[in-house]
Amino acid sequence: MRAEVLDGEIEALGPWFHNLHLPDGRQTAPDHALGDFPTFKWEEISQHIPADLTGWRVLDIGCNAGFYTFKLAERGAQVTAIDSDPLYLGQARWAAEQFDFGNRVEFREMQIYDLIRTDDTFDLIWFMGVLYHLRHPLLALDIVRRKARKLMVLQTLSMPGEETTSLPQDITLGERDRMLDPAWPKMAFIERKLRRDITNWWAPNRACVEAMVRASGFAVKGKIADETYLCEAAHQLPEIETQMIDAELRAATGT
């Protein structure tokens, strides 16, 4: 009877984007179009973060059904997970009961921009599959930087191309043709849809991802998987840039 109840609850909570492997062996999306997702992605990334996260506070942005939330909690972290979609949060809260994480995980319905109104800071920020859905990605990165104490794992949809280059401190108006170099940081704007999704707004190239990360005050430690970067909250921007960003944040967020 318990098995039938679980099957019914999984179906009622669907559709699922995260294929969770539940404690009794059931899977929430065994026929996922991407395969066993996000398990295969976790296997690529997990070796690049500490195996023991005891004492760490972690923020999972765009947590969906909570796959990464639960994996990070398994390593001992106290995880705050946010999403703006009540469907996914319903799945995540239900799944948390199956895994019995108790008070080690907390789910909040909120936008990434709402983080600026909280006093929370985090040792690790998990920022995967969200940036390209945001109309204001650099604003989001600026906010995230103010919440980060140690590390950030960032994944975003990207344009094809791996080229990067050493960027000059300044260029003249007459040198703008340099921006046509494939290695110059650039980001494609998606006015309509990509893969039938109206929330896919941006596709930066690798150089642009790394440049935006640096411009928000992170250091790029390395590319650890396809379209995925490990970043450190150690890069200090010049004071004049920090003051400018803070002023824009106050104006944009009303804080």
Residue ranges and their predicted role:
Residues 113-115, 122, 126-127, 135-254:
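S-adenosyl-L-methionine-dependent methyltransferase catalytic module, highlighting the catalytic core
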Residues 1-28:
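N-terminal, positively charged/glycine-rich alpha-helical extensions of SAM-dependent methyltransferases
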Residues 56-64:
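Conserved class I S-adenosyl-L-methionine
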Residues 67, 71, 75-109:
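Class I SAM-dependent methyltransferase SAM/SAH-binding core
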Residues 130:
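Hydrophobic adenine-recognition pocket in adenosine-nucleotide-binding enzymes
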Residues 35-54:
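Conserved alpha-helix/loop element of class I SAM-dependent methyltransferases that forms part
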Residues 26-37:
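Class I SAM-dependent methyltransferase Rossmann-like catalytic core
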